Curated annotation (Swiss-Prot):
Swiss-Prot/TrEMBL domain comment: Proteins of this family have an N-terminal nuclease domain and a C-terminal helicase/ATPase domain. In some CRISPR/Cas systems the domains are swapped, in others they are encoded separately.
Reported effect, residue 347 to A: Loss of R-loop unwinding
Annotated InterPro entries: Cas3-like_dom, CRISPR-assoc_Cas3_HD, CRISPR-assoc_Cas3_HD_sf, DEAD/DEAH_box_helicase_dom, Helicase_ATP-bd, Helicase_Cas3_CRISPR-ass_core, P-loop_NTPase
Provenance organism: Methanothermobacter thermautotrophicus (strain ATCC 29096 / DSM 1053 / JCM 10044 / NBRC 100330 / Delta H)
Sites where the protein binds Mg(2+): 67, 135
The protein's name: CRISPR-associated nuclease/helicase Cas3
Domain Helicase ATP-binding: 286-471
Length: 830
């Protein structure tokens, strides 16, 4: 067999994918390393983690070697089938591997190639480890040791080594052909030096020596080819393996590994000045501060913190990664920043969260020609110059999940913005702080933004040398929106809004009658309360129910309708859980709320008198708080904090409050002493204990880490019967029927839809249907409901409830999940 035939036959993936030949995938992966090397050279001064030429050469070598384990009988047969002419040729060559009934994963077989193509110093050990873990396998959690790997796969390794020994002359020429093909295609000094070093290292006598050691149970096998496994978490291996993974994945997807250019921030001062008008405080403050690398910005809700974050990122000339906890709010910011009069062009900014593709579909519907696959892939690989994302995508790397290195490798060239830090409870705060410590370790840039900095965060941020800037201290700060505006007059009602039997206080109806010409927001502490309260008013078209366990489509429609109507109409009432706090930019006239912790209270108040130019000068209260706790509230909030909150609220009952007074209330609550310690100290100790536990914590996959992090850990459940009841689209209805009928492959589903309807659709359009007609089911429903008896299957990460009664579908659409199950006690409130 001619050697060119071999290099032109061996595949890396099926032939319906781009660059399916192994030589082309390796070339494209090396090209990404070369591109990243050039990007690094251009932006060297902006990187806080320095990468030398020797390290880049090692990365290029690893990218050539990483998939050589795909030279395997079983792998190639699976890709090619039995009847192709190419397979007939290749089958003969790979026949020594035929006795392998089940081959090890290709990245494990690639380790054999690394034993005679790489050296054995510390850098080689890092690259060998990165090769082993460029896909998930058991060695992510287990010891990475050559002896352990060999004796786990002893028979397979002996067969594979014998294959290499038998075919060594052919394989020597094959490797030389691969090296020539790659370096001639790319014509790069880095690639040439990497290829030359592989040639220098290449020693086909080593497989014979290794096989001999295996047969003799030699004690020094582990030293034959070292792995990198430091006693403590190492930023070095995480960054380098992350770069290799990004190169591999972006090569497979056909997207660039890095898209940043300083042009992304061109004329940003002028754009912000034009949009805001006058002399924006953000530009003044940036001029005075010089943009410290680690900073906390404390500024009122609605004052323009997002604009400041863009200026801060521009000052440092790094990619802009902005995180916000709630998807709905993030979607709004994405559309605002990417709009025709926004700050970024369409190809400069991406969005990444579990339903982000829906935002791209909206863009496509507007005729903007978005390439969904490329946009989503580049966002996932952190290639975008500007990225909006939820924290569970980029700020949970301290949970040590597989693939976290891909995110960590971006930290040294990113300006990370963490907005709404006050929304995290102590456990989530610990994860965030631990991750910030990791970003700090690689000297990354971090901007924390908040309207109300929780006092218990301060000591952890101080330890990382964050500079705290309170806009109230800026000279001439009087023009900052909502800073000095007197916005809120609280009134306390010393009884619970609900009793333990979920009966509503008689005073609520009277308050609503007296304020019938106002837009009223009622915030309660759990979903069941919201549903029970809404039942009393559900015939009124001006009353809306909002919470997290509605169908996604219904929730989005209601939020959009409330936003639109509230601009011109009065007399609307929204009954909500605190999902409203950070997700919906709506200005209400009056809030009625249950007692909660002081920081949560003031967060809620931010929806009242939000977008006004003048002080609130009515003598009537616009914040009404039912201050007693019922049993359900006690399940959610710490009694110590509620008692302290209640005491502080009593001091300010009936007073008109501005932003500064409200912040001082938070400080007062957390200075309250309980058993010799302040609340602030109690929270700090709880966070420290959790951080300490994280030192020994690892989860296997990112989805597991996200589930641990999210305030509401749960399952997404698709409801096909809701599609059949409410959708008028024949394509959507056919899709629902197919899922009910147990179709599970996109290829089959798309083909069947076209056959039945005569119309073509895309996977992305059907994914949109999945999300819109899904509901979030908390994990505690698993044990306290008939969750599993309703579940008829799974599809693409969703559980499927394939047989629901019409009455249940109606209840789900109008009231949400809890109306079907009834009340299930939990501390979850959204």
């Amino acid at each position: 067999m001619a050697m060119m035939e071999l290099i032109d036959i061996i595949r890396a993936k099926s032939n319906d994918q781009r660059n399916y030949l192994l030589k082309d995938h390796l070339k494209e992966t090396v090209a990404r390393i070369d591109d990243f090397h050039n990007f690094y050279q251009t932006n060297r001064e902006k990187f806080s983690y320095k990468i030398g030429e020797k390290t880049f050469r090692a990365l290029a070598m690893a990218s050539i070697i990483h998939d050589l384990g795909k030279i395997d009988y079983n792998f190639q047969k699976k890709l090619m089938g039995d009847d192709s002419e190419a397979w007939e040729v290749l089958e003969e060559f790979l026949s020594p591997l035929k006795p392998l009934k089940r081959s090890p994963r290709h990245e494990i077989l690639s380790i054999i190639w690394s034993t005679f193509l790489l050296g054995n110093d510390d850098l080689d050990a890092m690259m060998r480890t990165a090769i082993l873990l460029h896909h998930y396998n058991e060695y992510f959690l287990n010891d990475k040791d050559l002896m352990e790997i060999i004796f786990t796969y002893r028979d397979a390794f002996e067969i594979y080594l014998n294959f290499i020994i038998e075919k060594k002359e052919t394989l020597r020429i094959f490797i030389e052909d691969i090296l020539n093909y790659i370096q001639n295609s790319l014509e790069s000094d880095l690639v040439i030096s990497a290829a030359d070093e592989i040639r220098s290292n290449m020693d086909f006598e080593k497989p014979e020596l290794l096989l001999e050691k295996i047969k003799e149970y030699d004690d020094d096998i582990s030293e034959f080819a070292a792995f990198y496994e430091p006693e403590e978490r190492s930023a070095d291996i995480l960054i380098l393996s992350g770069i290799l993974r990004r190169a591999d994945y972006s090569a497979s997807a056909g997207v660039d590994i890095e898209l940043f250019s300083e042009e992304v921030f061109r004329d940003i001062d002028e754009k912000i000045t034009s949009k805001i008008g006058g002399a924006p405080w953000q530009i003044r403050l940036m001029g005075e501060l010089g943009g410290p690398k680690k900073m906390v910005l404390v500024a009122p809700t609605g004052s323009g913190k997002t604009e400041f974050s863009i200026l801060w990122a521009a000052k440092h000339g790094r990619k802009f990664i902005y995180t916000l906890p709630l998807r709905v709010a993030l979607n709004d910011i994405f559309m605002r920043l990417r709009d025709s009069d926004g700050y970024f062009s369409e190809d400069e900014i991406d969005i990444l969260h579990s339903t982000a593709f829906i935002e791209y579909l909206k863009e496509e519907r507007l005729g903007r020609g978005t390439d969904l696959d490329s946009m989503m892939t580049s966002a996932r690989l952190m290639a975008s110059p500007a990225l909006l994302t939820t924290p569970d995508q980029v700020l949970i790397t301290s949970l040590n999940y597989f693939g976290s290195d891909k995110v960590i490798s971006v930290y040294p060239f990113a300006s990370m913005i963490l907005d709404e830090i006050q929304t995290y409870n102590e456990e989530m705060a610990a994860v965030i702080i631990k991750t910030l410590e990791l970003v700090n370790e690689v000297d990354g840039n971090i901007l924390v933004m908040t309207a109300t900095l929780p006092p218990y965060f301060r000591s952890f941020l101080d330890a990382m040398n964050f500079e705290v800037m309170d806009v109230a201290a800026i000279p001439g700060a009087h023009d900052i929106k909502n800073l000095n505006l007197k916005r809120h007059v609280p009134q306390l009602i010393e009884e619970p809004l609900f009793n333990d039997e979920l009966e509503v206080s008689d005073k609520l109806g009277k308050i609503l009658d007296e304020n019938s010409e106002k837009n009223v927001l009622i915030v309660v502490n759990n979903v069941q309360k919201a549903i029970e309260l809404y039942r009393e008013y559900q015939d009124d078209p001006d009353v809306y129910l909002l919470h997290s366990r509605l169908l996604e489509k219904v929730k989005s429609q209601r939020i959009g309708e409330v936003k639109k109507r509230s601009q011109d109409e009065r007399g609307l009432t929204v009954i909500s859980t605190q999902i409203i706090e950070a997700s919906v930019d709506i200005d209400f006239d009056l809030m009625i709320t249950e007692i909660s912790t002081i920081d949560s209270q003031i967060q809620r108040w931010g929806r009242i008198h939000r977008n006004r130019d003048a002080d609130y000068d009515s003598g009537d209260p616009n914040i009404i708080i039912f201050t007693d706790s019922d049993r359900r509230t006690s399940l959610i909030y710490d009694k110590k904090v509620l008692d302290a909150t209640r005491a502080i609220l009593e001091r300010y009952d009936g007073q008109i409050l501005d932003y500064n007074l409200e912040r001082s209330m938070i400080e007062e609550v957390f200075q309250e002493e309980i058993d010799g310690s302040t609340l602030k100290e109690i929270y700090e100790n709880q966070i420290r204990e959790t951080i300490s536990d994280l030192d020994y914590f690892t989860v296997e996959k990112r989805t597991q880490a996200q589930r641990l992090f999210r305030n509401m850990a749960g399952y997404k459940v698709f409801i096909p019967d809701a599609v059949l009841r409410y959708s008028e689209s024949e394509i959507e209805r056919t899709f629902a029927e197919l899922i009910k009928g147990d179709y599970r492959l996109w290829k089959d589903i798309l083909g069947e839809i076209e056959r039945i309807t005569g119309e073509k659709t895309t996977m992305w359009d059907l994914k949109k249907v999945l999300y819109e007609y899904s509901v979030n089911v908390p994990v505690f429903y698993e044990e306290k409901s008939d969750f599993w008896s309703r579940t008829t299957g799974e599809f693409k990460g969703f559980y499927v409830w394939g047989s629901m009664e019409d009455d249940d579908v109606e209840l789900l659409e109008e009231l949400g999940l809890d109306s079907i199950f009834g009340e299930t006690e939990s501390s979850l409130i959204v």
